[in-house]
Amino acid sequence: QFISDIDSCADALAALGLAASERITISMPTSPQGIIAFYAANKLGAVASMIHPLSTAKEIEFYLNVAKSRFALTLDAFYAKFKEVKDATPLSTLILARIPDYLGFVKRIGFNLTKGRLIPKVPPDPMVKWWADLMKGSYPKAAPARMGTDDLAVILYSGGTTGVPKGIMLSNMNFISEGKMVSEWGKLDNATSVLAILPIFHGFGLGVCI
């Protein structure tokens, strides 16, 4: 199912116009949507710019401009911050996910009756695409991009403790080598399951768990 969702997401992103070497900003907590979009972008040869979902509007503006992202994925709860900075950035397509997208029926109802009530409604907006709708759509099959190990795959950001955060450019080989290292260290094989709860917008969580 996971691989199927990645393929479906890649098809949807390609239909929206995301192409090789373009950037998509992923501003998500550790979640199915964030992880699926990460791999889908890589399948297309696009670059995932990973940012903290609790970033301020000013920080989001900075990150979108550094990465030159026309595309972004975030939760519906953070729509207003992206809308606020749209005109000052290259952003043209904002994909909104919802926490209940991957919850079971009972948990989804429970969320909508509690925490969900606190999330402001998103008004009609031509730049907004809903994750759930995209994943149900039908699109031409997107062919995997031909990528080299040294090609740019991800932009992560430094903490900015000594100044303005810097975009750290990571290649495909950075992740391949980290995967091999973790696999060897943990004696992992294709039958092993790992509970990954670290944040995907952080180097540790992205590099080790993803």
Where do the model's predicted regions map?
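Conserved S/T- and glycine-rich ATP-binding loop of Class I adenylate-forming
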Residues: 24, 41, 72, 152, ...
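Conserved AMP-binding loop of ANL adenylate-forming enzymes
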Residues: 26, 150-153, 174, 186-210
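Structural core segment of the AMP-binding/adenylate-forming
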Residues: 15-16, 43-133
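Conserved pre-ATP/AMP-binding loop-to-beta segment of ANL
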Residues: 119-157, 164, 187-193
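Conserved structural elements of the adenylate-forming
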Residues: 2-8, 135-138, 168-189, 197-201
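Hydrophobic alpha-helical segments in the ANL/AMP-binding
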Residues: 14, 32-51, 60-61, 182-184, ...
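Conserved AMP-binding/adenylate-forming core of the ANL superfamily
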Residues: 1-31, 35-39, 56-61, 172
